[in-house]
UniProtKB/Swiss-Prot annotation:
Pfam families: Dala_Dala_lig_C, Dala_Dala_lig_N. Belongs to the D-alanine--D-alanine ligase family. The lineage of its organism: Bacteria, Bacillati, Bacillota, Clostridia, Eubacteriales. Keywords: ATP-binding, Cell shape, Cell wall biogenesis/degradation, Cytoplasm, Ligase, Magnesium, Manganese, Metal-binding, Nucleotide-binding, Peptidoglycan synthesis. One of its GO terms (cellular component) is cytoplasm. InterPro entries: ATP-grasp, ATP_grasp_subdomain_1, D-Ala_lig_Van_CS, D_ala_D_ala, Dala_Dala_lig_C, Dala_Dala_lig_N, PreATP-grasp_dom_sf. Binds 2 magnesium or manganese ions per subunit. This is D-alanine--D-alanine ligase. Its EC number is 6.3.2.4. Its cofactor is Mg(2+); Mn(2+).
Amino acid sequence: MKIGVIMGGISTEREVSLNSGREVIKYLELLEHEIIPIIIDKKEDVVEKVKGIDFAFLALHGEFGEDGTVQSVLQTLDIPYSGCGPLTSAICMDKDMTKKILKYANINTADWVNVSSVEDIDYEAIEKIGYPVFVKPNSGGSSVATNLVKDGDGIKEAVELALKYDKEVMIENYTKGEEITCCMLNGKMLPVLAIRPHAEFFDYTAKYADGGSDEVVIELEENLHKKVEEMALACWKELKCEVYVRVDMIVKAGVPYVLELNTLPGMTKNSLFPKSANAVGISFAELLNSIVKYSLEVER
């Protein structure tokens, strides 16, 4: 099969995407497929560069990759691709929309408000949410332009920074607890990872630098494990996920809260999904093969 590995793109996560793409290519080649590296530098590249491939493996992150646009183009061209469809991708990229659906479905998530300008900042509403808060681009990833703000004095500056990366900014209560991630493959949860950043939170450096954080497979207490698994599965169903996603949570006093869903989890050597799969004996090459297989089974 001729597999095009699509990477690069136009988002702030371009370098992360290129790293993911290189790793994916290295291991897909072990499966004896014909691999075509496809580096996207501008939106128009997609239509031209995917000609002649049988399957698109998406190693893109962020805008024009994770937000449903590339998925829609590939679907229009009748080219099968990895991961979730356009609707789920678009919703999960929009943190505000994701949290609205989670709240409607009675799935725990931290309180938040969104603003689209400095003038929109409602300090009373933020006080009700409770400090400290995370201020971040509504549709950003990899914790780019994400700041932990401890009081009202830092809000304006943090919002201004986030607005450089997105037209909407989320201000979300900081739920202090243990951060965990649940990797879902074809609707089943792989082993849970605990994320223990060496910085105050799991920022860009902690995510991608060697030694930036400790990410370890953990065995949760039985009752908590059941709650986490039920919540991850509820997210999968409510947001109509397909093939694979990563559900990030915080556990506070034995109660899990969903932070966000990642529909195209990173595939670098430091990435969480391969670590979780490896804990049940699924090698990186086998994981990629499963993603291709399950993606081809989805009716688009």
